[in-house]
Regions:
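Cell-envelope/extracellular polymer assembly enzymes that use nucleotide-activated donors
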Residues: 2-4, 32
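Short alpha-helix within the catalytic core of nucleotide-sugar-dependent glycosyltransferases
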Residues: 20-21, 45-46, 73, 81, ...
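Acidic donor-binding segment of Leloir-type glycosyltransferases
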Residues: 22-61
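Glycine-rich, basic loop-to-helix element that forms the pyrophosphate-binding segment
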Residues: 62-79, 89
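Acidic metal-phosphate-binding loop of nucleotide-sugar-dependent transferases
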Residues: 66, 90-92, 118-120
Length: 127
């Protein structure tokens, strides 16, 4: 498996589905998706559970908020990919996001971390 995409989640019901769907829509499909729910009290855990039928999807359910770093480390421990991509629960990936990250990562063996370009959008404003 080429990549593991890791999404830590805490009360992300307003964004999580769009975030996950943007990952499934990637041009690069050799990846697994790992969502770590950190004790959410909104509907985001139910959203996360709705993807459990996909064999490339893994869900870790924490009964309480163990912190962002711990959740990320749980995802890394489960990951089987050659590369790991951390993705926020309120982010949206363009269809070629993972493909371009992997191309860049493989272009130079000295690269140890890569950050894509990002745009900050305010909900409802279009800017």
């Amino acid at each position: 498996m080429k990549a593991s995409v890791i999404i830590p989640n805490l009360n992300g019901a307003g964004w999580l589905r769009d975030s996950i769907e943007s990952i499934w829509a990637q041009t690069e499909q050799d990846f697994e998706l790992i969502v770590i729910d950190n004790g959410s009290t909104d509907e985001s855990l139910e959203i996360a559970r709705s993807y459990c039928g996909n064999p490339r999807y893994h869900l870790i359910e924490n009964s309480e908020n163990t912190g962002f770093s711990h959740a990320v480390n749980q995802g890394i421990a489960m990951a089987k990919g050659e590369y790991m991509a951390l993705f926020n629960n309120d982010a949206f990936a363009e269809p070629n996001w993972l493909e371009e990250l992997l191309k860049t990562a493989e272009s130079d063996p000295d690269f140890c971390g890569i950050q894509p370009d990002a745009a900050l959008l305010r909900a409802g404003t279009g800017r």
